Amino acid sequence: MEGVQTMFAKFIDVIQTFLTEPAILIGILVGVGYALDKKTPIKIITGMISAMVGLMMVLFGGFQFSATFKPVAEAVSKAYGVHGYLMDSYAMKAATQIALGDNFGYVGYVFVLAFFTNLLLVLFGRYTGAKGIFLTGNTGVSHSQAVLWLIVFWLGFGWVQSIVIAGVLTGVFWAFSTTLIVKPIAKVTNNAGFTIAHNQMLGLWFFSKFAHKFGDPEKHDAENLKLPGWLAIFNHNVTAIAIVMTLFVGGFQLATGIDNVQLMAKGKPWYIYIINLGLQFSMYMVILLQGVRMMVGEINGSFKGWQDRFIPNAIPAVDVAALLPFSPNAATLGFVFCTFGTIFSMGILLLIHSPIMVLPGFVPLFFSGGPIGVLANRMGGYRSVIICTFLLGIIQTFGTVWAIPLTRLAKEGVGWTGIFDWATLWPAICELLKFIASTFHLGPYSI
């Protein structure tokens, strides 16, 4: 019996390994899709590699954005002596891993069950309406461990029951949240053939409902602003991003004092360090743009095979960074005003002496503000970007304040992801779990 359990555990590990390597997974799906469509071996191989390299460029560019800005945010917090719970995906990963302790290994079972639940719902899409297949493996693992912890804490069931409930719940969330935004994403990307799998699917859907009310996407497009005189330099995407990010990030850094900036510069003149940061942000956006072009081209060409032979409704759901190059100026503007909305909300928390203070990481600011800025621009122009992303910063901040006590992770002193879906829907689900637990004397309410 132990041998069978060991083999099953190894089988789950192998599946999880493939599912958590998004580039390899996309490559396999593209290759099989081309094979099903009876393409030549050369096309199958070149398509697989192009898709894998493209997605790796998207992930690399996204990671570098985070890695570049993280020390800046930490320096600002330290300089002003502001302490609190971190709004960041990595904070949620760390906190839930600590909470699960020695049982963290069960997360793999939840993740695999969630993926196959998602796949099953799409397979029967004629009846369920589900279309999106969640392919962002690293984010999927983060979801799996968070949901497993919430189920274990609030319901207090055994591990088998908790794994099943968490896996099915996560898979249902993936299937329908990715499907919910198929039409808005198609509009933003000019029918590129994918949807989004990350932490702000409901956020994209929510803002798509009213982003068009704040302007004309043709007249007020952030990518086609007709600026007079020397301001025309901002009509060039690469230049605009470099200058805006140099001023924005540089302003944050200089607010901590030139001596602190010089320490971060590690031997370089502080002003050269700030200029380089702005140029790096622009470079990472160019990398993202090229990666998205490569990946989307192959996904469009290959998924016809899958749709014709097996899953007619299937739409691949990929990392949210894939949206950014569709409107780079709007992505930058969205990041800036999401940050302003977050700072505004933190000011309110300080004024009312909130017992919970949250500090934003880079991920909820850029990878929520940026994509929602892109969507808002395509629907209502730059004025919509400003309004929607400022509101986004407020929602994410106060939603995280709502979520932290409900997750019962506050004692770990780490934080919560803070991104839209996990600052709105999941705290509401926690309230429901809390009600069930108190009604039936489960989990923390058990006698």
Features from the language model and the residues they span:
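Signature of multi-pass transmembrane helix bundles
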Residues: 2-61, 105, 109-301, 310-320, ...
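Helix-loop-helix junctions within the multi-pass membrane cores of secondary transporters/permeases
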Residues: 28, 45, 72-95, 208-212, ...
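Membrane helical hairpin/interfacial module
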Residues: 51-107
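A short glycine-/small-residue-rich loop at the edge of a beta-strand within enzyme catalytic domains
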Residues: 67, 94, 286, 290, ...
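Mid-membrane cores of alpha-helical transmembrane segments in multi-pass membrane proteins
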Residues: 80-91, 109-117, 136-144, 167-171, ...
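Membrane-interfacial helix-loop connectors
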Residues: 136-155, 339-401
